[in-house]
Amino acid sequence: MAFELQDTKVSPIENKMSLMEKLEILSDAAKYDVSCSSSGVGRKGDGTGIGNTLKAGICHSFGADGRCISLLKILFTNECIYDCKYCINRRSNDVPRASFTPDEICELTIQFYRRNYIEGLFLSSGILQSPDYTMELICEAVYKLRTLHRFQGYIHVKAIPGAAPELVQRLGLLADRMSVNLELPTAEGLKNLAPNKHRKNILTPMRQIQQGITQNKNELTVYRHAPSFVPAGQSTQMIVGATPESDYQIMTVAENLYRKFELKRVYYSAFVSVNEDKDLPVLPGGPPLLREHRLYQADWLLRFYGFEAQELLSREKPNFNVLLDPKADWALRH
């Protein structure tokens, strides 16, 4: 798991603000990322460091014992070289910008943990200079947390599409869970609203993580002390309502992700209008939260009841009944 830390050139903006000013900006900027619920890792602390993934339950809702589990949820930076039309942090937006240093990420995580505010870290990021540069900084932060600070709590990190495979591998040996945001359900929607991003660059690290997890499971059967690779699995997130896809299309995409990439979770984020753009929908009623809720209910049927998307919806009936949950709707039709 060890690797050589590489020198990083800190962006000048990082030296212009206090740590608390950065925290205020970068915690607020992270609120639109919903994929921070987490589970499935059973690694215990060994008594020589701090943190314990098993004891915490590791989720941002409720643990098996009913306790609410807290993760420090922040962006490494809200600087971004991309100009995604739906994102508050798009390059062309005039918003306060900030970036942490790796040491500041460590300081915040350890101080928040020692004060019993959190039991883990959820770290996402905009793209500072390049995908590789950003991933190098994230790797350095997580490496220092694990080694210098002996932090053994839960860490969920967003992988940066387009970053070098060796950086994805490096981060996978440090994090409990990784995720790569699908962003939008279809490649066409991505091309229209996020012209700097490409579907292939998203699916490539997703496939690498899947293959790494499978290989690691085989290694652990032979040598139980082999370093773990993303032991809590991977997840993804897609925005719902920013593009015209039907619920049937969205559930079909989710079903394929579960089957082909063995994801632990697909998260659905109701589109929140934060920018004015001719290509973005106008939602007089606000974010489609009830639609998001129905998708989560249907997702549960896919993951735990073995349903297929075509059993719940079809081309003739492409959207869920907002007045009836998908399971009840299916029962009434059968």
Protein language model features and the residues they cover:
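Flexible, acidic/Gly-rich N-terminal and inter-domain linker regions that tether
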Residues: 1-79
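Short, charged beta->alpha transition segments
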Residues: 72-74, 103-114, 221-223
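Canonical Radical SAM [4Fe-4S] cluster-binding loop centered on the CxxxCxxC motif
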Residues: 74-103
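Hydrophobic residues within beta-strands of alpha/beta enzymes
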Residues: 87, 120-123, 178-180, 266
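Short acidic, glycine/Ser/Thr-rich loop/turn "cap" segments at secondary-structure junctions
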Residues: 89-95, 121-131, 155, 190
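Conserved AdoMet/S-adenosylmethionine-binding subsite of the radical SAM
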Residues: 106, 129-312
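Short Fe-S-cluster ligation motifs
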Residues: 108-124, 298
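Hydrophobic, secondary-structure "cap" segments at the distal end of domains
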Residues: 304, 309-334
